[in-house]
Amino acid sequence: MKSVLLFGVLLVTLFSYSSAEMLDDFDQADEDELLSLIEKEEARAKECTPRFYDCSHDRHSCCRSELFKDVCTCFYPEGGDNEVCTCQQPKHLKYMEKAAGKAKKFGGKIKKWFG
């Protein structure tokens, strides 16, 4: 009976050890994949179109603001037949960024008071 119990404990220990190593391998693969995605994002970010510049050549090339990506907005100017596209920030996202900035400042003040 003791040998069966000892064998069971040994089996569970080996199984948990092999599972832990497999999870470490998966975690390492996820970290490598994440790093490669970040490198690609940094490379892509260098070629973005700034706010209020023409984005008609690539409508997905607008730069990111502090929290959100700007949107390529196209319109026809008054009295013109040519379509004009520029990178702009939608108003609702602008207000959300302002609110987030104020909340961040307020959080800093609270931290200073109680920190």
Swiss-Prot record:
One of its GO terms (cellular component) is extracellular region. The presence of a 'disulfide through disulfide knot' structurally defines this protein as a knottin. Pfam families: Toxin_35. This is U3-lycotoxin-Ls1k. The keyword Signal applies. Disulfide bonds join 48-63, 55-72, 62-87, 74-85. Residues 21-44 form a propeptide. It is found in: Secreted. Belongs to the neurotoxin 19 (CSTX) family. 01 subfamily. GO terms for molecular function: toxin activity. It comes from the Eukaryota.
